[in-house]
Amino acid sequence: MKTHPLVSFVAVTVVSLSVAMADEKISEVPPAPGTALKEATLESVDAALKHGVDFLIVDQNPNGSWGGPTRTKGLNIYAPLPGAHHAFRAGASGLALAGLIDAADVRPEAVAAVAKGAEWTEKELPKLRRAEMTTTYNAWGHAYGLRAISRLHGLAKTEAEKSKWRTLGQQQVDLVNRYEDINGGWGYLDLFDDLATQKPSGITTSFTTATVLLAMHEGREEMGLKLDEKVVASSLLSIQRQRTPDESYVYSHDHRYSPRSPINRPAGSLARSQACNACLRDFGDETITDEVIHTWAERFLQREGFLSIGRKRPVPH
């Protein structure tokens, strides 16, 4: 009797997953060489926060934004001009501003940096759109911009100020909805199928989708923003399809068919997993328990050296 190829594929995949998970227990994963953890103290944490705030203050652009195409290291980053740079700057600025606000530093220079960042956000973020049909880098700008807006709403003292940030936040939700992929969720490239479509048909990625949904959830909790439940449901389903039994998440929708390739194994999912776990948990997935969160936090701390390679070495890939 012949076996259908799909049945064989499923069987091999299940066996591979089971063997891999049996071979690698999280508690037995040793720290990467040279990454032994130092015991944290309140003093060391405070010093680290101040160091980060000091960097953001010094690194802020004169117009209140952060980031810019000035240290590319000659890498092959596909960036259609000028929209790609607008998207990256919006994403970097939103992330930096959100972190600066979370640090709650009351020094005058830190307060001034927040004010400059808020002014830039109010003026420039509404202009953000897709650079062209081949990229949706703007998803990062909408998501991290929305995280900053939620915090600016929390800082606002008057109803007029709060209303201003709510309006801008709702605009960002509505804009990013335009760029949801046909498979649910969001990606950042749409150039591999030789199709140019109004609604992206590229590669939706688990981590981009989680980033956008986390920002939406926070915006709804903080400002009462209205979310499109169809968009939310299809995007959550996209993440679930990219989830493996050990709470690793494959890189993209197409990677579902090679779940144990190196990029999709636990070390490859190091930064993706907690974003996706947090997203699913925020939207009510009860399978993302405290144990799952703690397990992946431990794994992250043990293997953070992998991320440092991509962050600091000349060629991140």
Q: What do these predicted ranges mean?
A:
Residues 2, 19-317:
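Preference for long, amphipathic alpha-helical scaffolds in soluble/luminal domains
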Residues 8-18:
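Bacterial N-terminal signal peptides
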